[in-house]
Amino acid sequence: MSVMMDTILNLGLNDKIVVEIHTKIGNERFAYDSYRRFIIQMFGDIVMEVPYADFEKVLQGIKDKVGVKLDNELKIKDFKEVIAGYKKLINKKKRHEFPQDVQERLKQAIHVIFGNNPMAITYIFINDIPHTRGIAVNIVAKVFSNMGDTSVSGFAFTPNPATGEKAFFGDI
């Protein structure tokens, strides 16, 4: 996961796949938390350009309603309500539903990176990358860091992508 570019995790999740994950793994909280947090909120913000703060308002409204402070205190029914709220928000702001077709979502995400993405343009400018070289889109399988207390993920680079220093750089 690059610290320099937008990241959309779990692009392949949709209403059907989230049920399959819950069924196969046996962890409904993980499935629905991943769906609301990574795909709807990230994709909605980065690709569909619905402000991240608007998603946070939906989430905070539900946390206030059920009387909790932290996301991990929400129950599964609350996560499902958050997901419904996020979808309603997207429909209201964009006048169409959150896309369930994973291939269509992938195309939209790639278009954002290769399109007029301000973060990509800034990255190209700062690193003096010629327009003839362009940028890349990485599509990889993800290690889940939110499956429980024994899960973690991270990233590592050499050289440091922020400074160019020839040293190890990473985070978990």
What spans do the regions from the language model cover?
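Nucleotide/phosphate-binding sheet-loop regions of phosphoryl- and nucleotidyl-transfer enzymes
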Residues: 1-172
